[in-house]
C-alpha cells in the first residue's frame, strides 16, 4: 500500500507540473492564435496545392518538391506536410487552427523535455523550471507564431 501511494504521489506531481507547463505556455502564446499567415506560409502552405487533402500523403515521404509551390524550394519534411494536410482537412485555411496546432506541438515537445529531464535529474521542480524556461524563451516563439516553422518545435 505504501508503494502505491508513493507512486500515486509522484504521478500526481508530474501531472500537475505538466499541467502547469501547458497553462504557462497557453498564457504566454495565446495572443498569437489570431496571427495571420506570413512569409514562407505563402509558398509552402497557402499556395501549395499538395496539402489540400491526403491524396498525396504517400508522396510526401518520397518527393521533397511537394513542400512548396515554388520550383527548387523543396525540403524533405513529410510529417510537416502531413500535419498541414490534416489541418486543411479539419478547418481549411483557418489560421487559428494552424496556430493552435503549432501551440499543441510546442506543448507536447515541452512535456517530452520535462519527462527527459526528470528521468536524468530525478527532480520534478528543477525539470519543470528548465522546461518552462525553454518553452517561453523568445527563441522558442518562432515555431508557435510562424506556421511554417512548425518543424522547428
Stretches with model-predicted labels:
Residues 1-153:
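Polytopic membrane enzymes that build or remodel cell-surface glycoconjugates and lipids
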Amino acid at each position: 500500500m505504501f508503494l502505491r501511494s508513493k507512486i500515486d504521489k509522484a504521478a500526481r506531481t508530474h501531472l500537475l507540473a505538466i499541467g502547469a507547463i501547458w497553462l504557462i505556455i497557453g498564457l504566454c502564446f495565446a495572443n498569437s492564435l489570431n496571427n495571420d499567415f506570413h512569409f514562407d506560409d505563402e509558398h509552402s502552405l497557402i499556395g501549395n496545392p499538395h496539402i489540400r487533402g491526403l491524396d498525396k500523403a504517400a508522396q510526401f515521404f518520397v518527393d521533397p518538391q511537394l513542400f512548396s509551390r515554388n520550383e527548387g524550394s523543396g525540403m524533405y519534411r513529410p510529417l510537416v506536410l502531413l500535419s498541414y494536410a490534416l489541418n486543411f482537412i479539419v478547418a481549411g485555411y483557418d489560421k487559428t487552427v494552424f496556430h493552435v496546432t503549432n501551440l499543441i506541438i510546442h506543448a507536447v515537445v515541452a512535456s517530452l523535455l520535462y519527462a527527459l529531464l526528470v528521468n536524468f535529474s530525478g527532480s520534478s521542480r528543477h525539470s519543470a523550471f528548465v522546461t518552462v524556461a525553454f518553452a517561453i524563451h523568445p527563441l522558442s516563439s518562432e515555431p508557435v507564431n510562424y506556421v511554417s516553422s512548425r518543424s522547428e518545435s
